[in-house]
Structures are given as C-alpha cells and as structure tokens.
C-alpha cells in the first residue's frame, strides 16, 4: 500500500475518532486512542510515532527537521508565511520570539490547526516568558541566580516557568544556559550564565532543568561545548575557544555532563571555533569549522563520549557564526550531516529541503537516517503530550501567567540573591539608629527610587538624586550637603555591561563616592552587573543588588536594616577584593520584612477581598472618608493598603505614608510603654498610689488611687471632663485665645489659635476636684492619663513626647510617630480629624482632635500621638516580640507579658491595654476570633491596633471617621474595625495557620 493511500485512511480514521463537541473546531489533528467498532485504547508512543511518520511522504518528513522563527508582534504577511511553511513543507515546530502572550496563544492554536502533525512549540525563555513576551513574569537572569545558595528556589522557578509554558502551549524552553562565564568581557553570555564556578553552574542548571522537566516541559542545555570563555558574539561572527581538550573536559563540559547524566531532553550546539574538538579548517578562513557543523563535536564528543541521546538543536542558523561562511540551505545540510536533529531558524526552508534531498541523492545521508531523526522528534512530541493535543484556552491568559506564585518565587529569588560583599566596619544591619543621621543618594535614576522608599520604612532619611549627565557643579553641591550626614547610602542605577565604559558609572559618581568616603560612612549598593564591583575596591560597605527592579531594590534596603538576612555570594570575580563565592552572612532578621501574604501561606485574594468589601462599604455609607489597613504576620508586613480620600470632598487620595491622629491608641504606644520603662527600672509600681508620685494629691480624693486600678479603669474616675467649655464662647471670652502667641497665650490648640496659660492650670484643678464613683466598678476614663503624663515627666525631667522619642521612637527608627505633626510635616500628609464648629471653628488638621490633649499643647497622656501605619506597627511589633526589636531590648519580656495580660476575673483589661471581651454576653471589643491573649487599643478618631501573640499577628487600622463631624457614629455602629479584623482571621483560617486560644 502506498504512503498516500495509507495517509488518507489514517487521516479519516483520526478525524472520526477525534470529533467531539470539544474538538470540532480543530481539524486534521491526532488522537490519543486507536478506535474501531469494538473498542478504543490508549495509543503507545511507538504506535503514535509510526502513525505520524506514515502520514508524511519522505519529502514531507524533511520538514519535521525544521523549527522556524515565529513572531506574535508581526503582521498578517508573516502569519501567512508561517502558515504556508506549515502546510506546504510540514515543518516540525516553531520557536516563538517577540510579542504578547495572548497573541501567541491565538497564533499557536491557528498554526496547530493548520498542521497535519502537531507542531513542537518552543521559546527562548532563559528568565521566563518575559525574555520574549511582554506583560509576563520576568525572573532574575542566571548570573543573579548564581548568587543564591538555596538551589531549591531555582527548582521552584523552573516549575513555575514550566507551568507558564504549558499554559501557552509551549513544549520546549531553550534553557538553562550552562556556559561557565570565565571571561568578564564576554559580549553574548555575561549575565545569561550562572557564573564562573563549574560546580555552582552545574548545580543551578540541574535545579532549573529538573523544575521544568519534572513538570512536563523539555529543557535544553546550551551552548555546547561551552560559550563562556569567548570575547565575541556568535550572532555577529565566529568566536573561538582556545581551551585544550583537558580544559574542556575539566571546565566547560562539566555542566553538560551533569545534566546529561540527569536526563536533560535537549542540547543546543553553539557556533564556536574549538580547535581542540575539531581542527578542520573553514574554506577561505584561518578559523576551524563551527561546532554546529562538526561531526566530531556532535556525534563523537556529545553523543558518543558524553552519551547524550536526546534531541540535538542547532543554535539559530541565521547567526553569522555559521551563516557568514555558507549559503542558506548549504549550511542546513552541513548541520544535519554533523548530527543535529533540529535545524533552528533556517534562513530558507524550501531551499534547505532541496539541498537535503540532493544530499540524499548523493548518499551523503540516507532516508533511514532522516527517518530516525524524525522519529526522535516525534517521540519528543509524544512526550510533550501532543498525541493528546488540545487547543489553548484563550480565556484569562494574562491572569493565569501573572499569578501570585510567580510573584512569590520572584521575591524569594531576589531576597536570597542580595549580596553583602563587604562590611569592614561591621555596620550591617544598621543599629543604634538614634545616633545616626541618614541620607540617601540615587545615581542615574529618573526619580526617587523604590530603594529609597524602602529605606523610609526603617529610619528617617534625607533623599537626594543625581544623574550622570548632571554638571560637575551639581556633584560638588551634593558633596557639601551629604558630608554633614553620619551615614550616606548611595544606590547606583541604570548601569550597562560595558567594562570599557565603566559599566555606565560616570567618573563624577566614582569621585563623589571616593570623596564622601573620606569624610563620612558610605554604603554603596549597585543594581547592575557584579563586574562593576571592581570600581569600588576601597568602599568599606558594599552591596551587590544585581537587578534594577522593585524587588531587588526593596530587599536590598531590607537587608541593610535587618528585615532580611544577607545570604547571597558573588557568582563571578570582579577584582581581588570581590571574588566569586564572597558574601557575608548576617544574623536572623531583627526588623520587619515587607513581603506578600503568600510568603506566610495566606492568599492575597482571601485577605484582600474581605477587607476591601468592608472598607468600600465604610466609604460608601460615609462612615469614614478613607483609611489605611496594615497586617503583619510572623514579623512580616504582608498587607498595607490605602483606601479613599482625606475628606469626602477634597479629592486628595489617601497614601500609606499618611499620618493619622491615633487618639486613645496614644495610651498604649506612648504613655504605657513609658510607664513600663519605669517599671523595668523599679521607679514605677503598679501597687503604688498616686500620692506616692504626686505628693500634691495627698489631700485630695485622688491621692489614694492605686496605679493598677487606674490602668484597668476601675479607680472610679469620671470618664472625661469637657475642659474646653470653660473657654466658651470664644467670641466673648477674649482672654482665652489669641491668633498669635504671646507671653500668656502660648498654648497651641489649633491653627492660629493660642490658649492662655491659666486655662492649662485649670485642667489640673478640675481633675483634682472631680468626684469618684465606687472603686472596683469599670468606667473607662482618660483622666488618669493626665496624671501619668505628669508622673513620667517628673521622672524623666523632660516632656512626655521627648522621653518617648528618646526611649522608643528614635531608636526604633520611626520617622512619623510623634505629637504635633504640623511642626514637622506638610499638612497635606495629615488627614483632618474634624471640622470643629463647636470649639475651634476650623478644620482640625495636624493638631490633636481631642480637646483635653489640645489644651495641654497637643501632648496628652491619653491622646495626641500621630503616626503612619508602619510606625504604629513597628511599635506594636516590638511589644509582640516581648519588648525586642532591631536587635535591641526596649522592655523586659516579663514586663510586656504582665502589662498585656488580663489583670482580674470579670475584667478584660490589661494594664493600660485593652483585650478581647471574654464574656459572650458583653459587646465584643475585638473580633470574636481573636484569642484572649490579644492586646491593643482603639482610638476615637477611627483607629485601632491589635497584637495577637498566638497567631503572631498584628493589625493596624487608621481612619478619620470623625471628619467632618465627631457625632458620625456609622463607623462604630457598623462595627468596621472588628469586621476588618474578622476578615483577617478568616483569611488565616483558610490558610490553616489559625490558632484560637
């Protein structure tokens, strides 16, 4: 029976077996079963291969050897040409280049539907699909991966890349590059290599390969026999490798041997002149034959000596490394005769097929040999699942590719790559922050960088920028400014790979850094090639950030301050002072890490969906104009998001860096920690009476009040006293206020509103004269905190704000927390708390909302503190850590445990801290899912913070629900704070990390 008749029969049978409702749109495709009237059964590899082979004439089988370049960003002319090659010449596969994922998927379906035998779809995706396709995840380049010590992360990356390839119908990824980059001036390999150490290269290549192969994508080791020690680009010419055969076996071939031993599916052969492998001269040239065209390189060395039996791919045949010596078609024949199975990127498929047919006629190669090559290709197609071909689902491709797992893997790779090259003065991670004045300088970034914004989370920074193109005068001015700071962190961006051009780092920049090093402490962080480290051999603190992306910039900053540990090691040698394998390891993290929920096993969707719904409801019902939510777990900030606007009418959007009035959260983030500090030193006793600290109260009804009773709100104090009413009406009481300060009116209560000193003194008398209710009954009161303020100030011999700043805020690196923020920040960063028509007759913005605290000059023991979400979270994390943060003990662990614990049966309160309500008959103070060990507080302005030791969980909510009127109780009545906390616990429950009591 002729092959044509057999082909017709097989096609008809295949179509009949294949037609189902799901597959009707696709024609002339293969099936996974062989069917007859009696039964159907799964088809074996050999059966399927022979079936497909018989579908093709001998001439058509030649087409299977070709893999043609396809683009998804070109026009219809290109698409039609590819379709013509598929239909007319039965080409075996496509290698996709630039374009988009959605377009490539559509084209793949179209091309597959045009092909009698399914096409093998491939891509150059060394750092993922993003190497060719826009808007897809970009993983780090291999040189960056060479710095990572945990190869399991690279295996995970390979698995994710495999999943993304499968989603796009790709079967082969031409990765990993296993070249050993021994030449810093290599123009084509460079950061595509894992580095210069053969063991490191091999181990990482194996991890990457196994990640793909174990998940159904065929890997391809390249560029055989090793393109690492070259100084020319084979795209443009024929590079030479001068290694002798022993060196090749010892170095260049080592990674190939290791991958072959572990079953790598493919090897790509490079266009290299390697006399030690084949010294046959090229015609009219003093160079030897390219390895792509050398039987000695492929059949003898690769297949016989190294034992490789998988698919052998040429490197692209349009590259000048071979195309510069032979005509199109001729070069294809020579590549085939050399032993290659797949001819990649042929310049002229029709001519190449004709030339191969001539070679068969000349008996240079047999049809049997061709058929064996085609069988290898078909077996690869079977292995790729093409015997069960299904078209690509075109729905949700972008979402599926840009998934949370890819983001998490990318972050972990960046985190583990950051390399602390040198730290001669033992500064990293930075400590004793209160003793340092920090400045940052970004070089050649267009604006303030993600690196600089990340630094802001850890300390107060003065940020500066310079560009290489700036005149020398600008550099001189920056020097005069920066030399006054104790620590300057210089980040270098937008570098290049050219050693002759100092990697894009201008001489002015190098001189500025050198001059700064002579007068202050300088840390240099380079987001570029590690070879550029040679320019900074005398920099005592040097960090390699590798890639100029958000993740690398963020984690470099985190490493400097102990948010993450330094783990990376240099993959290459830049100088005698920066050698391969060099990298300091720092201690375990001591400060917040900033990451994504998936880093602690929580899905962002689970967390965000519930929180967003409640916050949107709150804004829609005008329970609040906007706010910020922060969630930290296991010492990691996993969620920080802003919502809404500063007011209902302003149009000024909230930012996570905005500074809110904390109201009564002041108690547990200022006053109570100060009392705890005194408790640690033995100068405060919770069993003592007020008169022991304030003798002037001895003859009042307050003198015998016990500290513990005041802190748990059972001392009988009145809830509050409207002190401000004594100054009203302001229009009549002209003695009370002035618009400008003077010797009497100098207490600021609002913008251009200064209260007279006698009213300040009146406050203390009113409290002393106030009545007491029965002791032992719970009544929430602010009045005791007026006394705590005075007691702390008497002890410290300084104001409450200064003592808290000295003991906590500055050492913790908190840049926004404090009183009276209008003195330190632009008013635009501070959402207003109320349009106060009752007293101050103005928008209260940057001044404390609480009337009593305002009459104390904005510094109250019960209210007055402002902060952004991050600073508040750090303060609470310190207490969640048992008083420890940033490598430093701020409070004794036993003291924290004592103050944050429930103090007596029947009362939920800790010492100053609020806690979950244990009585189910009472209104919950927190989410009912919060364990009883949780501690925190709420604030009248719409704030709260809760720390849960059992789940190592921290929750911060900031809002200005009192704007424009404090009488708006929708926020409280709708239980916004607790419901957001519920949503957080529900997300944790779904992650199976939740602990209840």
Pin down the residues of each PLM region.
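Short, surface-exposed loop or secondary-structure junction motifs
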Residues: 702-932
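Bacterial N-terminal signal peptides
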Residues: 8-17
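Hydrophobic faces of well-ordered beta-strands that scaffold small-molecule active sites
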Residues: 63-70, 92-96, 119-125, 172-176, ...
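Preference for extracellular/luminal or secreted protein segments
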Residues: 25-84, 294-295, 325-603
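Short, gly/Ser/Thr-rich active-site loops of penicillin-recognizing serine hydrolases
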Residues: 370-375, 379-387, 462-471, 571-578, ...
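Short active-site loop at a secondary-structure junction
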Residues: 610, 620-628, 649-712, 771-784, ...
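Second-shell residues forming the walls of enzyme active-site clefts
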Residues: 57, 104-119, 129-131, 196-369, ...
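Short, conserved catalytic-motif segment at the N-terminal edge
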Residues: 602-662, 683-685, 850, 966, ...
